[in-house]
Amino acid sequence: IKQIIQLANTYKTPITFRAAGTSLSGQSSCDGVLVVIKFAFKKIKINKDANEITLGCGVVGIHANESLAFLKKKIGPDPATINSALIGGIINNNSSGMCCGTKDNSYKTLRSIRVILANGSMLDTSDALSVARFKDENKKLINELREIKEEINANKELKDLIIKKFKIKNTTGYSLNAFVDYDDEIDILAHLLIGSEGTLGFVSEVKLAVLDDLEFKACALLFFDNINNAANTIKEFAKVDFVSSAEIMDYASLKAASTYDELRDILADIKEGNTCVLIQSEHSNELKLDENINKIKEISKLAYKSYFSKNKAEYDLWWKIRKALLPIAASLRKAGSTVITEDVCFNIEDLADGIKSIQELFYKYGFGDNGIIFGHALAGNIHFIITPDLNNKLEFDNFSNLVKEMSNIVASYGGSIKAEHGTGRMVAPFVEVEWGKQAYL
């Protein structure tokens, strides 16, 4: 990699690092040299206290969890693509997922990082000698990081904006919260690299804190008459600490999922506007889990129909359907069309209005027959899928206008145009729309 970077500098050729390419936001497309890292950097090492794991950037996410399974541990980030996504992509996009939220993502669980910068400098933040050498060789960079931090600290409006923006999931632009959360320049740089999509350096290795994988789990499948009832219930779930995940699926998602034989009976009576929420709760003690289930039942009184299960085979099926919504939508699209998946985040109190705004855009721009909405509602994070024919000028223009209007709507709510999929080429033109000129510059 160091040689590739040296050659790229010599010949003034841009390079892009590609992990598994599961993000679909355009991070791994380029017109220069594409460096594919999935065949190398496979290091997995658990420390003796079993509270940290060192991972090479080429490790598949699920393999990290499989190596921790005998300890009943797991890594924090839990993207739906964890069976394919590589650690390099998970780290560089600050990918989160269904349970980790903002509390246990890559940024929050990072303990050390190993990186090569564009100038060839190498830094391993777990090695004091490497840190000292890096500081000595990169005084200008260290000073610039310090100056940016001082500039942010001196600007209350900007600092408050950064703090507010990162209370919810946000991968639009760089991790500016690093300048607020950390004082040491090396810590700032390490956390700036999270979510930087390879634009600041090549991250070859990370050390992450590991979490307990709680033994006892239960899930609930809750059906609501409309988005409002679902969103109001999710607001209540967000106030408690015993719900680890709440996945929302709109009517179009349920209609698509009804093609699965195993769910045909459960979904037989759904009507236009109905919404489903898949809940997960977990605990180290089964009796405590049972108590949590009863509390969930109390909170879920707005649901017109509900299913509860501690049977792994049963709730795994529910999760399988949730995770399969993207391939289901892909299989139902018309010939020649493209699967587009977007990823936004609203503050939890704006969730219902935000979802309705997206649905209105579907119909305004001609995607009402193929647009579906689902996502990690406990974090206010929703995904939507549309399938435009980008070779059709009208559909291309409609898609372009939808994305532009969506970006302005999400920004008007104080939300994130990209919550966990990374900025990529898709959202790069809209970073300033969300952040404003002051933060963007």
Residue ranges and their predicted role:
Residues 178-186, 190-401, 407-409, 413-416, ...:
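C-terminal substrate-recognition/cap domain of FAD-linked oxidoreductases
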Residues 129-186:
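Phosphate/pyrophosphate- and phosphate-bearing ligand-binding catalytic cores of soluble enzymes
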Residues 1-15, 37-79, 95-147, 212-225, ...:
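N-terminal glycine-rich flavin-associated loop
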Residues 24-25, 68-117, 161, 165-189, ...:
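A gly/ser-rich beta-alpha-beta helix-loop segment of oxidoreductase catalytic cores
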Residues 31-34, 293, 399-403, 439-440:
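Amphipathic alpha-helical segments in well-structured domains
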Residues 1-41, 55, 75-76, 365, ...:
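Glycine-rich N-terminal segment of FAD-binding domains in flavoprotein oxidoreductases
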Residues 328, 332-335, 429-441:
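Activity-critical C-terminal alpha-helical subdomain
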Residues 413-418, 424, 433-441:
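Contiguous mid-protein beta-loop-alpha structural module that forms a pocket-lining wall or clamp
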